[in-house]
Amino acid sequence: MQQLTEIVAQALAEVANASDLKALDDIRVDYLGKKGKITDMMKMMGSLSAEEKPAFGQAVNQAKQAVQQTLSERIDGLKASELEAKLIAEKIDVTLPGRTLELGGLHPVTRTIERIETFFGELGFVVKQGPEIEDDFHNFDALNISEHHPARADHDTFYFNPKVMLRTQTSGVQIRTMEHEKPPLRIISPGRVYRNDYDQTHTPMFHQVEGLMVAENVNFAELKGILHDFLRNFFEEDLQVRFRPSYFPFTEPSAEVDVMGKNGKWLEVLGCGMVHPNVLRSVGIDPEKYSGFAFGMGVERLTMLRYGVNDLRAFFENDLRFLKQFK
C-alpha cells in the first residue's frame, strides 16, 4: 500500500508540473495505460490473501480515479488557458467599420454587345447563334468567297483540316438561318471569331456582330438609315458619318462606314452592303423576289472608340485596374 501511495503522489506531482497537453497525455499513459505504473499494481493481487484482495483492489481503483480526476482538471485548465491566449491574440476591435464585399462588373466587351443587341432588338432584329467550329461551305463557299481568296490562306485562318476551321466571321450564322427560315428575316449574330493575327489592334480571338435583313424590296437607303441611327445611338452624339465604296465578296454594292473622330480624322467602324445574289441562291432564296442587306462590326474596335482605349489586347489581360474603370 505504501508503494501505491508513493506512485499516486508522484503522478499528482507530475500532473501539477505539466505545461502542455502532450505532457499530460504522456503522464496518463505512464500511470494509467495498459502497462502503466498504477495498472501494474493489480498484478500484486495474486500474492495477497483472500481477505486482503478486496481492500487492495479498492485502493488501486481509488488511486486510478484520483489520478484521472486530477488529469481531467489539469487538461481543462490548460485548454482554457490556451483558448484565452488565442482569443487575446485574435482580439477583434468591434468598433472598426465592416469590410464591404467588392462586386464584379460587366466586361466592356459584354457591355458593347448588350448595347448593340438592345438597339437592333428594338428594330425587330433577333439574336442568332452558331458554331465556332465551322465548315468551309458556311464560312467561305456560301458567302461567294472564291477558292483562291486570301481569306482562305493558312496564315489567316486556323484550320483543323482543309474543310474545317475556326470561323473567321459570324456570317455562317446568317447562312444557317437562311437555310432553315424563310424571308422576311431580321437577325444579328454576335460571337467570337478567330484569325491568325496579333498586334496592338488585333488579337487571334475577337468578337463580331453581324446583321442581316432579307425581305422584298430591301434597299441600300434602309441600310444607311439604320446604321446611321445605330452609330449616333452607340456613341451618344451627333456624329458625322460617311459611307465609302468598298468590296466584299458577299455583298454588292459594298461600303465601309467611317465616323469623324475628335481628332478630325475619319475612323473606320464597320462594313456593309447589299447581299450578293449568289449568296441568296446558295441558300435557296430567289434574288429576283427578295433582296437584303448585311453589315458587320468588330466589337472590340467599337469598344476602343467608345471608351478611348488604345490597345485592344488590354481587354483580355484580366488586369483589374483596367477593368474596374468600366463598372
UniProtKB/Swiss-Prot annotation:
Biological process, per Gene Ontology: phenylalanyl-tRNA aminoacylation
EC assignment: 6.1.1.20
Localization terms from the record: Cytoplasm
Cofactor binding, per record: Binds 2 magnesium ions per tetramer.
Cofactor: Mg(2+)
Binding site for Mg(2+): 252
Domain of life where this protein originates: Bacteria
Catalytic activity: tRNA(Phe) + L-phenylalanine + ATP = L-phenylalanyl-tRNA(Phe) + AMP + diphosphate + H(+)
Gene Ontology CC terms, in alphabetical order: cytoplasm
Annotated keywords: Aminoacyl-tRNA synthetase, ATP-binding, Cytoplasm, Ligase, Magnesium, Metal-binding, Nucleotide-binding, Protein biosynthesis
GO molecular function ontology, one term from the record: magnesium ion binding
InterPro entries membership: aa-tRNA-synth_II, aa-tRNA-synth_II/BPL/LPL, Phe-tRNA-synth_IIc_asu, Phe-tRNA_ligase_II_N, Phe_tRNA_ligase_alpha1_bac, Phenylalanyl-tRNA_Synthase, tRNA-bd_arm
Signal peptide, first to last residue: none
NCBIfam families referenced in this protein's UniProt entry, alphabetically: pheS (TIGR00468)
Annotated family: Belongs to the class-II aminoacyl-tRNA synthetase family. Phe-tRNA synthetase alpha subunit type 1 subfamily.
Subunit relationships: Tetramer of two alpha and two beta subunits.
Protein name in the entry: Phenylalanine--tRNA ligase alpha subunit
Species, as recorded: Shewanella denitrificans (strain OS217 / ATCC BAA-1090 / DSM 15013)
